[in-house]
């Protein structure tokens, strides 16, 4: 197998490859662009006009998605997966991946859409580099631009695999993309309603790609992801890469749960208190009248919505950041 097929090994070792461009036996081009960044270009006769960005490891301890991308890269390098799409593989936060930690200094997935300009340090620099890599990759016009940013969650979830669909002014959510997610094993999608500061929010809002954050189970160390079943997603990505995917049918979205953001819970001070157990699962239902959180100055978050559920509760975020999201069932 080509040396560039071992992108994860190179990244974990912090090494640059001797050869930064290699060709597979059938002419597929592998190009090491930067640490943790590999661009795959199919031979011209097979190119189907799709540009697919696959990122993982924005949080360094979320290893199941990293392992998934590593398997895909190795198949491409070995010639068993023959791309028809251009693919950019990104391991987002190499130093955090090496340490096995969520992040080193700052949560990188809060540093996109210009937020890195307000910060400093390794994660801010890397977020800017990832934006640049994505911008160059998606600069070819008249092509399909698609981005999946793969994650696992700090906690368990009542809905194991779900997606977050960013928002941008004047754009509608795509039914065919929702159908593609459903076919890949995604059980629910959260339709966001304002600009975000995540990697997928950047590629969706600034670069015009169809982009999603995929939450795929609970975060575990390398080699301990047997309970995270990514078989359907992996097969769907292989079909996207080799161009043999059937066009998803967006006319019916049976089996896919849709949610919208009702409110974000923002932590304003060190006095913030979230009235949930530490092990509460994502998508836990909360009854109207429930006192969810309190903060300085008598600020209270009381559940008013019928059918409300909580996702990403985290009272340990920095002041000014989101400590949870209340979501409610939605329709397109």
UniProtKB/Swiss-Prot annotation:
Reactions performed catalytically: N-succinyl-L-glutamate + H2O = L-glutamate + succinate
Enzyme class, first EC level, given as a word: hydrolase
Keywords attached to this entry: Arginine metabolism, Hydrolase, Metal-binding, Zinc
Gene Ontology MF terms: hydrolase activity, acting on ester bonds; succinylglutamate desuccinylase activity; zinc ion binding
Record Gene3D superfamilies: Zn peptidases
Cofactor note: Binds 1 zinc ion per subunit.
Organism domain of life: Bacteria
InterPro entries: AspA/AstE_fam, AstE_AspA_cat, Aste_AspA_hybrid_dom, SuccinylGlu_desuccinylase
Pathway info: Amino-acid degradation; L-arginine degradation via AST pathway; L-glutamate and succinate from L-arginine: step 5/5
Enzyme Commission (EC) number: 3.5.1.96
Residue numbers annotated as active site: 215
Family of the protein in this entry: Belongs to the AspA/AstE family. Succinylglutamate desuccinylase subfamily.
NCBIfam families: arg_catab_astE (TIGR03242), PRK05324.1 (NF003706)
Described function: Transforms N(2)-succinylglutamate into succinate and glutamate.
PANTHER family to which the protein is assigned, alphabetical: ASPARTOACYLASE (PTHR15162), SUCCINYLGLUTAMATE DESUCCINYLASE (PTHR15162:SF7)
Protein name per the record: Succinylglutamate desuccinylase
Species per Swiss-Prot/TrEMBL record: Pseudomonas aeruginosa (strain UCBPP-PA14)
């Amino acid at each position: 197998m080509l040396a560039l097929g071992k992108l994860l090994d190179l990244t974990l070792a912090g090494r640059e490859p001797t050869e930064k461009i290699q060709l597979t036996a059938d002419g597929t081009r592998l190009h090491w662009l930067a640490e943790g960044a590999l661009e795959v270009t199919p031979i011209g006769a097979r190119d189907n006009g799709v540009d697919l960005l696959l990122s993982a490891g924005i949080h360094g301890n979320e290893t199941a998605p990293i392992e998934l991308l590593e398997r895909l890269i190795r198949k491409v390098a070995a010639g068993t997966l023959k791309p028809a799409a251009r693919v950019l593989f990104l391991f987002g936060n190499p130093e955090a991946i090496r340490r096995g930690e969520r992040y080193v200094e700052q949560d990188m997935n809060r540093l996109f859409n210009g937020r890195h300009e307000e910060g400093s340090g390794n994660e801010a620099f890397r977020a800017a580099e990832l934006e640049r890599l994505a911008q160059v990759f998606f600069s070819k016009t008249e092509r399909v631009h698609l981005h999946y940013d793969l994650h696992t969650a700090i906690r368990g979830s009542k809905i194991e695999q779900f997606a977050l669909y960013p928002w941008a002014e004047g754009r509608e959510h795509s039914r065919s993309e929702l159908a593609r997610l459903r076919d890949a094993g995604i059980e629910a999608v959260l339709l966001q309603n304002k600009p975000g500061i995540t990697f997928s929010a950047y590629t969706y809002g600034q670069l015009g790609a169809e982009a999603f954050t995929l939450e795929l189970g609970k975060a575990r160390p390398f080699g301990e992801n047997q309970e995270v079943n990514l078989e359907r997603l992996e097969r769907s990505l292989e079909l996207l890469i080799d161009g043999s995917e059937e066009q998803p049918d967006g006319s019916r979205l049976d089996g896919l749960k849709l949610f919208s953001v009702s409110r974000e819970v923002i932590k304003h001070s060190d006095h913030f208190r979230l009235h949930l157990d530490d092990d509460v699962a994502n998508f836990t239902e909360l009854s109207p009248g429930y006192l969810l959180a309190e903060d300085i100055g008598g600020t209270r978050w009381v559940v008013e919505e019928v059918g409300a559920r909580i996702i990403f509760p985290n009272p340990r975020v920095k002041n000014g950041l989101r400590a949870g999201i209340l979501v409610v069932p939605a329709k397109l």
